[in-house]
Amino acid sequence: MTQGKRKHPCDLKNPSKRAPPATCNKPNGAILCGDFCLHEGYNIGKCVMRRTGKACICSQCEGW
């Protein structure tokens, strides 16, 4: 029996939302990402590496 990749508990209740493209590529990208997520009603936002570059991901959970 194979198990799929487990989702983070925060992802189950609170689907992540992406900020506008290239937000995290700017010098102050982390700040812009956090501000965008707060404005959208999330608790936290951070830049993560993806295959296509950095992406801003919003979450309701701290420390994810």
UniProtKB/Swiss-Prot annotation:
Carries keyword RNA-binding? no
> Which residues form each disulfide bond in the chain?
10-61, 24-47, 33-56, 37-58
What is any one GO biological process for this UniProt entry? defense response to fungus
User: What keywords appear on the UniProt entry?
Assistant: Antimicrobial, Disulfide bond, Fungicide, Plant defense
Could you tell me which residues belong to the region Disordered? 1-21
* Entry annotated with the keyword Disulfide bond: yes
Q: Which family does it belong to?
A: Belongs to the DEFL family.
- Name listed for the protein in its UniProt record: Defensin-like protein 41
Q: Which organism is it from?
A: Arabidopsis thaliana (Mouse-ear cress)
Q: Which lineage do the record's taxonomy fields give for this organism?
A: Eukaryota, Viridiplantae, Streptophyta, Embryophyta, Tracheophyta
